[in-house]
Amino acid sequence: ALPILLDNLLKWTKSQIGKLKVVYQDINMVEVVEGVSEIFTMVASLKNIKIVQDVPVENVAVRADIDMIKTVIRNLISNAIKFSNEGSEVVVSLAEEDGMAIVSVKDSGCGIDDENQKKLLHTDTHFSTFGTNNEEGSGLGLLLCQDFVVKNGGKLWFTSKKGDGSTFSFSIPLLEK
């Protein structure tokens, strides 16, 4: 967890001072989502959590910075595992809607209370949360995700209900055909 936090902090700092170059390229989101999801299979299995992929068979093409998009998906899946209960599922899905590729990561964890929902995704607030194995979360990874998604022409949002899990989603524009 510490290496991920340090990596996020470094990327966030570089991004905020304009030292992180965005390199756009044509990418197949199906391959990216599947590849990043598979990386977490072993980590999830340590908590007896199953990662379920719901992705289309056909190519979902976008023009984006692949490293940024992978970082976003990694952070969302890592958080979902952190906040999910043992023996549950994390669902990673990809869909096309209104000219956008939509990636969603749904957990079956504790959810986020209304007060912390208001604080999430804002740089001027701070709070700590704890995962199901007492792993601490600072919110920095989500700020980085939001920043990277915006730099790729999309947006990040979430739905959550205390006691009923959370779904974090982001959109990026599809490659024009």
Regions found by a protein language model. Give the residues of each.
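Coiled-coil phosphoacceptor/dimerization helix of two-component systems
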Residues: A1-W12, V32
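Short alpha-helical Gxxx[C/S/T] motif in the catalytic ATP-binding
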Residues: E136, G141, C145
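Short conserved segment of the HATPase_c
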Residues: I112-H126
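Conserved catalytic submotifs in the C-terminal HATPase_c
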Residues: V23-N28, E34, S45, K50-V60
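Short helix-loop "hinge" at the ATP-lid/N-box region of the Bergerat-fold HATPase_c
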Residues: A80-I81
